[in-house]
């Protein structure tokens, strides 16, 4: 028996019968024969493929809510991804589900995010003329764009969880549902931290009715939400919150949209960011020869608009600014904010 087979046997001994077992995966887009020397389950291999990908490394230079904030402690897509992973791992472990699958989904769920957060999604949607959704782009990254067009060839359950971590369609696995919830828990709580750091909020601004249910600081809120999911899901046999906590979380998200996500401080640079990406899109549409050479073969398969979207979506915030400066700002000039 190989090490991998022993790990798969251990999963059957210790995990909840409702868990997604590695040896029951629906497989990969392209068949890969088992290798006797591989000591990892399919989901463990998927984690490693994602973490070693170029798209994953770029997450550290893509901002979350505040565009290019001054300071070292604001969240990026990378820190958000790690927080989602830790929350999801805690919940899956407590419920006896597959931590490896949850971690793989969490690590890959935001790989397709544009520079400048959701402002980038809006910009590309307007330019391209089609809805640009980061969850669909994340799947495109792992299926196609990574490894020079070959993709990472991830397991079905990981790909499903990445695609369905947001939007109307829900994941097929409980682990995918947990990552979807963990994403909500992570971003609403760390965005409060960043808003407090930016001077937009204080903890006292959060409505008392919400704080009395979820807690009065970052640690209390996350602990309440995680523990409530664990207790409620154990009894219900699915991933859910109690009605009281569900309502409080929904109200907290509404509060954050009103006070933070639509706040002039958070949104002040969005107009500039959208205009920057739109001008880059228009430039590459007019000058496809200026695209990097590794994107040229894609033009004949996907068309110019789709290829330009892929290129811009893969940019980090700083790279987008640098390309804009290189193309549109005369050498030696400085842009004043």
Language-model features: locations:
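Short alpha-helix carrying the canonical HExxH Zn2+-binding catalytic motif
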Residues: 103-108
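Gly/Ser/Thr-rich helix-start
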Residues: 113, 118, 315
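A glycine- and small-aliphatic-rich helix-loop capping segment at beta-alpha/alpha-beta transitions
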Residues: 117-128
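Histidine-centered, transition-metal-coordinating active-site segments
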Residues: 1-77, 81, 85-91, 98-99, ...
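Short active-site segment of divalent metal-dependent hydrolases/proteases
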Residues: 112-113, 186
């Amino acid at each position: 028996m190989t090490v991998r087979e022993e790990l798969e046997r251990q999963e059957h001994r210790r995990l909840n019968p409702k868990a997604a077992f590695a040896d029951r995966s629906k497989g990969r887009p392209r068949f890969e024969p088992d290798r006797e020397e591989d000591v990892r389950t399919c989901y463990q291999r998927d984690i490693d493929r994602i973490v070693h990908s170029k798209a994953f490394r770029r997450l550290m230079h893509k901002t979350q809510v505040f565009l290019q904030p001054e300071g070292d402690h604001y969240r990026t897509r990378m820190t958000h991804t790690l927080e989602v992973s830790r929350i999801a791992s805690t919940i899956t472990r407590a419920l006896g589900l597959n931590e490896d699958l949850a971690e793989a989904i969490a690590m890959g769920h935001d790989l397709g995010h544009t520079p400048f957060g959701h402002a980038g999604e809006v910009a590309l949607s307007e330019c391209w003329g089609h809805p640009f959704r980061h969850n669909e782009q994340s799947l495109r990254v792992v299926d196609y764009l990574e490894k020079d067009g070959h993709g990472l060839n991830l397991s079905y359950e990981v790909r499903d969880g990445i695609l369905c971590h947001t939007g109307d369609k829900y994941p097929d696995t409980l682990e995918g549902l947990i990552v979807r919830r963990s994403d909500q828990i992570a971003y609403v709580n760390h965005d409060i931290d960043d808003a407090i750091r930016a001077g937009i909020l204080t903890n006292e601004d959060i409505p008392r009715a919400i704080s009395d249910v979820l807690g009065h600081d970052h640690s209390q809120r996350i602990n309440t939400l995680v523990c409530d999911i664990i207790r409620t899901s154990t009894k219900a046999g699915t991933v859910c919150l109690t009605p009281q906590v569900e309502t409080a979380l929904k109200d907290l998200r509404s509060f954050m949209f009103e006070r933070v996500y639509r706040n002039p401080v958070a949104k002040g640079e969005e107009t500039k960011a959208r205009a920057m990406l739109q001008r880059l899109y228009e430039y590459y549409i007019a000058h496809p020869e200026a695209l990097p050479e590794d994107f040229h073969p894609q033009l004949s398969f996907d068309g110019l608009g789709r290829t330009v979207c892929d290129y811009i979506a893969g940019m980090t915030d700083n790279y987008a600014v640098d390309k804009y400066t290189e193309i549109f700002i005369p050498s030696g000039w400085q842009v004043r904010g």
